[in-house]
Amino acid sequence: MGQFTVVSLGLLAMFLSLSGAKGDNCPASWISRNGVCNKLFPDRKTWLEAEMYCRALKPGCHLASLHRDSDSTVLAWYISDHFKGAGHVWIGLRDTNRKRTWKWSDRTSTNYFSWNQGEPNNVQDNENCVHLWAPSGYLKWNDEPCASLHPFICQYKL
């Protein structure tokens, strides 16, 4: 009877772990945060090339959008810990109509900003895209010409 109980408990544990695997986990090379999956791509691309690359990965995938300090902290840790020397990293924020109206590429609400001191400064009236600023440990943002080449973070909702 004792052996039957151990086997039954083992089967129950296996069933529960399999029933929890509903495809709501991020792939192995992606990180999970607040219901989304993120992955840093070290290839250097313009902002638009990076956004198009993310969109081609899967439906609903875009450059990352950040909506709270905890989002910034998780991504900063991920980049700093796994991709030392990546440089600045594109996120999905952009001023599409050049009126200093910032919008996320995934069309989520723009309710949070983490600008570096003195930013956005729109140097030479040509800084309409946003990256995570490397010297801040990837916690602060800087506006940059969209044609600059940087690694980037893609994101999709679970």
From Swiss-Prot:
**Which keywords fit this entry according to its UniProt record?**
Calcium, Disulfide bond, Hemagglutinin, Lectin, Metal-binding, Secreted, Signal, Toxin
Q: Which residues bind Ca(2+)?
A: E127, N142, D143
Q: Does the keyword Signal apply?
A: yes
- Per the record, the domain of life is Eukaryota
Which segment of the chain is annotated as a signal peptide?
1-23
An example Gene Ontology cellular component term from the record? extracellular region
Q: Where in the cell is it found?
A: Secreted
Q: Which SUPFAM superfamilies match?
A: C-type lectin-like
- Keyword Metal-binding on entry: yes
List each copy of the C-type lectin domain by range.
33-155
User: Which Pfam families is this protein grouped with?
Assistant: Lectin_C (PF00059)
Q: Which GO terms describe its molecular function?
A: carbohydrate binding; metal ion binding; toxin activity
Under InterPro entries, the record lists: C-type_lectin-like, C-type_lectin-like/link_sf, C-type_lectin/snaclec_domain, C-type_lectin_CS, CTDL_fold
Tissues where this protein is expressed = Expressed by the venom gland.
Concerning PROSITE patterns, the annotation shows: C_TYPE_LECTIN_1 (PS00615), C_TYPE_LECTIN_2 (PS50041)
Q: Which cysteines are joined by disulfide bonds?
A: C26-C37, C54-C154, C129-C146
Q: Where is this motif: Mannose-binding?
A: 119-121
Family assignment from sequence similarity: Belongs to the true venom lectin family.
Role: Mannose-binding lectin which recognizes specific carbohydrate structures and agglutinates a variety of animal cells by binding to cell-surface glycoproteins and glycolipids. May be a calcium-dependent lectin.
- Name recorded for this polypeptide: C-type lection lectoxin-Enh3
Organism name:
Pseudoferania polylepis
